[in-house]
Amino acid sequence: MPDFFVLARVVGSDGAFPKWKERLVPLCEVSATEPYSTSYYWGQDVDGEPDTLWGLEGYAHPVGFFIGHPASDVFKREMKKVDEDRLLRHVQGLGSPDYDLHYYDMHYGFLTRPDDKDKDCKDSFVAAIHFWAPEGRRKQLLGTLSAGVDRVRASESAPHITIQSFAVLKECLDVNMATLYIRTRSRKDWETLQSSTIFKELLSDIEPVNQKSEIHQSQAFNGHIDQNPPIGPV
């Protein structure tokens, strides 16, 4: 079974970011101990919505997200504080549309590299690129993105690793959608990747099988990524 992921966009109310950052300290701590947890990596939007958060949650089995994480006393306590402080922009509560979630299976790629000395750092720069293929063409889109992973992986070696994550995620509900999750050591490293020949060639290769795309950028500040789940292999 492929690892299960949720990419969460959380739309905060004006000025809410400092309190969100506080709430995520215990949430990140408890997440790392949960049996199925592999990733729980959070950042602040840098595309003009500073009170919006972006988080990647990863689990060895979907039960970790739908049942395990929300069942913890820490989660219930912190979500109560979120509601009391009205940290969501439009509607409070777990059912709020301000929790904008996409559900994925890992398709291909890497979230960490064993030769990256900073692979566990909490302050990387993240770009999530959503792609939508024409009807019936997602398989080709996924294949093209996966070929790009291999080229990117081969382009760097220790000790000079700047591209820390380059993962192709297959959306579970939208059968035309895929997301490329990119994590670099800094924003400058992301800008360097964007202007590189290898990245431009990938975007060019994708054009025939891509109808629409969106780029969302964030600066990470807490969490863990690609750990072995405490429960062990599933």
Model-derived regions, located:
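Short S/T/G/P-rich N-terminal loop/turn motif that feeds into the first structured element of a domain
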Residues: 1-234
